[in-house]
Amino acid sequence: MSTSEGDELATLVISLRRHLQRQQRMGVRFVARPEVATMTPTTMESKEPAPDKVERVSTHSDRGEVSSLEELRDDIGDCRRCKLHLGRTHVVFGIGNPNAKLMFVGEGPGRDEDLKGEPFVGRAGQLLTDIITKGMGLTREDVYIANVVKCRPPENRNPEPDEVASCEPFLKKQIELIRPKIIVALGKFAVQALLQSKVPITRLRGNWHTYMGIKLMPTFHPAYLLRNPADKKLVWEDIKKVMKEMQSENA
């Protein structure tokens, strides 16, 4: 058995185990075996191997619509819905308070995030943590942090349209389940993906927008700030608007 065949078999076993666990939670205790048709040597020889299939994008579990982040993560599984799975180490789902009032959405995992399986843990992640803790007086556990795509793009390139299309239903479902009061979109790509706009981030940032009925504030990505520290003051202005809005929501 080749390495790729072994990987496929392992993935199949994991998927089957998850399916059986779902069925058990639904009360299913046995599955009737369908009648197996007899295959003649002729049909066996003429049968061509089935082409590789792309997994169907769905936010429905076997029990129906998913109702928690845990179920959503379980449905994503060892995702192979786009080519990003070929080079990733971990699916980087998201982290934080499932009932957060504030949600940060970035572009996609980088090298550190891919290795750890957690968003924003590298140098850019430390800067975001400083914004949350030192600037806003919150903790990472108070907010929720996710990305537009859940797997690292090669060489940290921008995700391609088909990759975004594969991940977008899961991000939308995350937002539906968390239902934050405010979303902070970090960086050009996240902003344009969420707002479906090609307007430059320099014109969008600092102004309130709406996504799925939720207030959205675009601002620069922490990685951009590492390269352009002079623009930190602009992000701070954006964050102060977010803090003011959060205070009015709590009033």
Residue ranges and their predicted role:
Residues 10, 14, 18, 22, ...:
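A polyanion-binding, active-site-adjacent surface
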